[in-house]
């Protein structure tokens, strides 16, 4: 029986890797579930649990930040004592809520997304959690807003943390702007930088269309971040991969 069980698990892993596009990067789904059930879910704030379960019912739920990454962001923001933050790409607001719960009562989040309707799915939960006053939500493309911010020198170096989880084909365009807005010693977080594990997959690997389409943009971003002398970087296999860039100049 043990051999049969091992064969089933091996077959499941093969099936998973035949189509790149799985949210967790861990090879074992059971191990990922262990992390969630042992470390994440027992300590997840009730409001984040409510929003996670609400988002799971939405047809585009794959866009949400994973629960383990939400926990990571929440702790990271506390460690760096972040107060003035920015989020590019909001969806229903799970990572936004993780940020809002981590920063102080007078902290601020400039949040941008092209779809307010998705944001309003999570807004009642955010309001009930008592942190909606920290959020300045802007509907529409982020680049025009960033251009306005960069134009005013008073905004340079004023952000403690900036999280980017939006259109992957604009990640480099975002980086060109937000590098001036984050303070020296501040952090930028780029989500999905391991892109469903597709970055090292053979060219003939079956992939979902969106995974294949954005793959080259993520590869280009990762090379650009590694070559940027203005930041120190650390790529972490949390969620779908997150790269942290600490501005040093």
Curated annotation (Swiss-Prot):
Residues binding a divalent metal cation, per UniProt: 165, 191-192
Function: Involved in the production of floral volatile phenylpropanoids in flowers of fragrant cultivars (e.g. cv. Mitchell and cv. V26) from cinnamic acid, a common precursor with the anthocyanin biosynthesis pathway involved in flower pigmentation. Methylates caffeoyl-CoA to feruloyl-CoA, also able to methylate 5-hydroxyferuloyl-CoA.
Annotated compartments: Cytoplasm, Cytosol
Entry keyword Transcription: no
Name of the protein in its database record: Caffeoyl-CoA O-methyltransferase 1
Cofactor (UniProt): a divalent metal cation
Annotated organism of origin: Petunia hybrida (Petunia)
Pathway this chain belongs to: Aromatic compound metabolism; phenylpropanoid biosynthesis
CDD domains: AdoMet_MTases
Classification via PROSITE patterns: SAM_OMT_I
Tissue: Mostly expressed in petal limbs and tubes, and, at low levels, in flower buds, stamens, pistils, stems, roots and leaves.
Binding site for S-adenosyl-L-methionine: 65, 87, 89-90, 95, 113, 142, 167
Keyword annotations from UniProtKB, A to Z: Cytoplasm, Lignin biosynthesis, Metal-binding, Methyltransferase, S-adenosyl-L-methionine, Transferase
Gene: CCOAOMT1
Gene knockout outcome: Reduction of eugenol production but not of isoeugenol associated with abnormally purple-colored leaves and stems (e.g. especially in vascular bundles), and pink flowers due to the accumulation of anthocyanins (e.g. petunidin, delphinidin, malvidin and peonidin); purple floral buds and pink blush upon petals opening that fade in older flowers. Disturbed CoA esters homeostasis and reduced lignin levels, but accumulation of anthocyanins associated with perturbated biosynthetic gene expression.
Family classification: Belongs to the class I-like SAM-binding methyltransferase superfamily. Cation-dependent O-methyltransferase family. CCoAMT subfamily.
Gene Ontology CC entries for this record: cytosol
């Amino acid at each position: 029986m043990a051999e049969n069980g091992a064969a089933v698990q091996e077959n499941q892993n093969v099936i998973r890797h035949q189509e790149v596009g799985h949210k967790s990067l861990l090879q074992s789904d059971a191990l990922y579930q262990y992390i969630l059930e042992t470390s994440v879910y027992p300590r997840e704030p009730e409001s984040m649990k409510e929003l996670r379960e609400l988002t799971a019912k939405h047809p585009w739920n794959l866009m949400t930040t994973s629960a383990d990454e939400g926990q990571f962001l929440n702790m990271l923001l506390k460690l760096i004592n972040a107060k003035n933050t920015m989020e590019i790409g909001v969806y229903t607001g799970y990572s936004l809520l993780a940020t809002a719960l981590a920063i102080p009562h007078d902290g601020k989040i400039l949040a941008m997304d092209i779809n307010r309707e998705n944001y309003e799915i999570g807004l009642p939960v955010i309001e009930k959690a008592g942190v909606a006053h920290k959020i300045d939500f802007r509907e529409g493309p982020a680049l025009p807003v960033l251009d306005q911010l960069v134009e005013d020198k008073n905004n340079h170096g004023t952000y403690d943390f900036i999280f980017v989880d939006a259109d992957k084909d604009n990640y480099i365009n975002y980086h060109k702007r937000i590098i001036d807005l984050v303070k020296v010693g501040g952090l930028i977080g780029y989500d999905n930088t391991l892109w469903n594990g597709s970055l090292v997959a053979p060219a003939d690997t079956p992939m979902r269309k969106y995974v294949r389409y954005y793959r080259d943009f993520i590869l280009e971003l990762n090379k650009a971040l590694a070559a940027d002398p203005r930041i120190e970087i650390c790529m972490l296999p949390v969620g779908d991969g997150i790269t942290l860039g600490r501005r040093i100049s």
